[in-house]
């Protein structure tokens, strides 16, 4: 059992017969009454986000999530095929499991597949990915003093804001946490 006082971002817990990942939490000590922990949790099966309040010191069950390194092979209609790097066993995941992750997945990419009691519940991407720009407007020379941006579409179909100097064919390093441009690759 884990005390809610020990919550950390990314911790997985089992509450109300569901598996939750702690996205955000805050310890609150009101002037009157007992302390409590306000948390924002993501259901790993459905993807739903819920705010939940726990009394300070309350205990919750930890969820033992198993991470397996796998390589993304290809998309087959609405399913996506991954291969285990150790056993070479292939696993298919529906697009329902891969919501935001589809913006960054490209063939050959290494990911962590998360399972709970044999059931696949999610995919964890690397913190950054390198993707090639397939479409963007040409930048206007000399117009970089203002830090202006333009939109660009990368090879996966994802569209993001980039600096004006980025051109088609450039390789970009993108943060998978928030989808933002970091630098050219």
From Swiss-Prot:
One of its GO terms (biological process) is peptide biosynthetic process. GO terms for cellular component: cytoplasm. NCBIfam families: efp, PRK00529.1. The gene is efp. It comes from Staphylococcus aureus (strain NCTC 8325 / PS 47). Belongs to the elongation factor P family. The keyword NADP does not apply. InterPro entries: Elong-fact-P_C, NA-bd_OB-fold, Rib_uL2_dom2, Transl_elong_fac_P/YeiP, Transl_elong_KOW-like, Transl_elong_P/YeiP_cen, Transl_elong_P/YeiP_CS, Transl_elongation_fac_P. Involved in peptide bond synthesis. Stimulates efficient translation and peptide-bond synthesis on native or reconstituted 70S ribosomes in vitro. Probably functions indirectly by altering the affinity of the ribosome for aminoacyl-tRNA, thus increasing their reactivity as acceptors for peptidyl transferase. It is found in: Cytoplasm. Keywords: Cytoplasm, Elongation factor, Protein biosynthesis. This is Elongation factor P. SUPFAM superfamilies: Nucleic acid-binding proteins, Translation proteins SH3-like domain. It holds the Pfam family Elong-fact-P_C.
């Amino acid at each position: 059992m884990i005390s809610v006082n020990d919550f950390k971002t990314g911790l997985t817990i089992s509450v109300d017969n569901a598996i939750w990942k702690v996205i955000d939490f805050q310890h609150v000590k009101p002037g009157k009454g007992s302390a409590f922990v306000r948390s924002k949790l993501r259901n790993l099966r459905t993807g739903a986000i819920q705010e939940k309040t726990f009394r300070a010191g309350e205990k919750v069950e930890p969820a033992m999530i198993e991470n397996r390194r796998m390589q993304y092979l290809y998309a087959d209609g609405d399913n996506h095929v991954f291969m285990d790097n150790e056993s070479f066993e292939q696993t298919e995941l529906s697009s329902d499991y891969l919501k935001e992750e589809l913006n960054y997945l490209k063939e050959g990419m290494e990911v962590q597949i998360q399972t709970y009691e044999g059931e696949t519940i999610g995919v964890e991407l690397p913190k950054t990915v390198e993707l090639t720009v397939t479409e963007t407007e040409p930048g206007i020379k000399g117009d970089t003093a203002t830090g202006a941006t333009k939109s660009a579409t990368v090879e996966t179909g994802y569209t993001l804001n980039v600096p004006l100097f980025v051109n088609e064919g450039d390789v970009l390093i993108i943060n998978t946490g928030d989808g933002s441009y970091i630098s050219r690759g």
